[in-house]
């Protein structure tokens, strides 16, 4: 009676440990963020090119466009490893993707924990960033719009108080300051007037020369740091939800990549096993 020794081997070769669901789910997951990263880089580069070179170089460290480009490039490289690694079933790229994503997640977690544990130092760092932004207020249009939005949103002016605007060369109160905005504050510090159809951009003229009581009739006198801290304390659940929303995609990416890596390793072992037993007529 004729034997069919190679039928099980053929059956074994048709079987694969690699799940198409996991493979393509990870691929499309990375593809989505890959596209988002390219949009971020494109927007950042466009915003950068639209600025004057001198103004852009003056405040490179606080330029939102630079931050957008850096985050976009890092996300692009990370998701590129995930896309190609999952599509080509490349263990090296998948491990790189998983390790980098784990490092990003741990850094975010550590930053959040340290921010709560060392709240005073975090507050000092925020104060330093805000003061640096005030200094470069007129140098960068994006930064200027961001500060104006923040002061309107939180009903505040400056870092600690409205007099922090004296750090800016245009708003400085020194007698030798030739600027027309000397001792003033930006219009975003002004109290809203419901019946005013057109925004008065000169409403903050000379406000730093007044004391708190007099200035409070026209502008916000409280600093943005205290307002920001109070807002954070009042919206902890919202911030927790945002943090969770950022963490879940990262954890999903780490989990899927590790599952796929283990499946690829099992598939490699199966292929090696089949190759070693092909010479066996009873296999």
From Swiss-Prot:
SUPFAM superfamilies: Tetraspanin. The chain crosses the membrane at residues 25-45, 65-85, 97-117, 236-256. One of its GO terms (cellular component) is tetraspanin-enriched microdomain. Glycans are attached at residue 172. It is found in: Cell membrane; Cell junction, Adherens junction; Cytoplasm. Keywords: Cell junction, Cell membrane, Cytoplasm, Disulfide bond, Glycoprotein, Membrane, Transmembrane, Transmembrane helix. It is a multi-pass membrane protein. The keyword Ion transport does not apply. Residues 46-64, 118-235 are extracellular. Residues 1-24, 86-96, 257-283 are cytoplasmic. PANTHER family: TETRASPANIN (PTHR19282), TETRASPANIN-33 (PTHR19282:SF154). Belongs to the tetraspanin (TM4SF) family. This is Tetraspanin-33.
């Amino acid at each position: 009676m004729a034997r069919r020794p190679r039928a099980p081997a053929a059956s074994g070769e048709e079987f694969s440990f690699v799940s198409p669901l996991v493979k393509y789910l990870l691929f499309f997951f990375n593809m989505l963020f890959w596209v988002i990263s390219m949009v971020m880089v494109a927007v950042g580069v466009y915003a950068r090119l639209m600025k004057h070179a001198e103004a852009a170089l003056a405040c490179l460290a606080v330029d939102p466009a630079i931050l957008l480009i850096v985050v976009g490039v890092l996300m692009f490289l990370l998701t590129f490893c995930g896309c190609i690694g999952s599509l080509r079933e490349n263990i090296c790229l998948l491990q790189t993707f998983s390790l980098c994503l784990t490092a990003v997640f741990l850094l975010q977690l550590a930053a959040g924990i340290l921010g709560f544990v060392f709240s005073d130092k975090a507050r000092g760092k925020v104060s330093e960033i805000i003061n640096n932004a005030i200094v470069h207020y007129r140098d960068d249009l994006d930064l200027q719009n961001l500060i104006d939005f923040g002061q309107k949103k939180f009903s505040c002016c400056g870092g600690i108080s409205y007099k922090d605007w004296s750090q800016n060369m245009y708003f400085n109160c020194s007698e030798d300051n030739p600027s027309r905005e000397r001792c003033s504050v930006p219009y975003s510090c002004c109290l809203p007037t419901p019946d005013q159809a057109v925004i008065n951009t000169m409403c903050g003229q000379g406000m730093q020369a007044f004391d708190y009581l007099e200035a409070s009739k026209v502008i916000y006198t409280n600093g943005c740091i205290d307002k920001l801290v109070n807002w954070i304390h009042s919206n902890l659940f919202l911030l927790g939800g945002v943090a969770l929303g950022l963490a879940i995609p990262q954890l999903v990416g780490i989990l899927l990549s590790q599952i796929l890596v283990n499946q690829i390793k099992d598939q490699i072992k199966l292929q090696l096993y089949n190759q070693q037993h092909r010479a066996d007529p009873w296999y």
